[in-house]
Amino acid sequence: MNSKESPFQFEKADDSSGFLLWQVTNLWQRGIKKALEKHELTHSQFVLLASVHWLTLAKQSVTQVLLSSHTKIDPMSTSTVLRSLQEKGLLKRQEHETDTRAKTVSLTDKGITLVNQAVKTVEQYDDEFFSPLAKESKDFNKKLVALLSRKLESE
């Protein structure tokens, strides 16, 4: 596309990293959504459940603020999703022992059972989806972390 009227800097759409990332993200999210249907979880619910479990296994005191920071989900959405998970009996939210403004989050036995099953499902899907990267996946992940780090520094 070399027209003087064109606002695009790229000859082909496939030369645009942003457009490619958008396409890949949509494709991946559609697959994740389908994979999680059998667990009756949305992607956000899964990410928060898995993060509570991950942080708990790392011996961290899990708060809503920590979860929001860890997942990059805004605090209001984090609170809304956690409330829905609490209503499903998958987690508990309690007053923090020392900070009365904070809430700690922990999984119930039902939540632990479900997240263990769902993690296997998602990891199987990820393995299949990202298999074309094969040996390059570690380098790919490092580049994604670099993009995340750069974005966080500018905020």
Which residue ranges define each predicted feature?
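Charged, amphipathic alpha-helical coiled-coil/dimerization segments
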Residues: S3-K4, R83-K142
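C-terminal regulatory/oligomerization modules of transcriptional regulators
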Residues: M1-F10, K59, K135-E155
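Solvent-exposed, non-membrane alpha-helical residues enriched in polar/charged side chains
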Residues: K33, E37, S68, I112, ...
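Short, hydrophobic-biased segments on the C-terminal half of alpha helices
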Residues: Q64, L82-R83
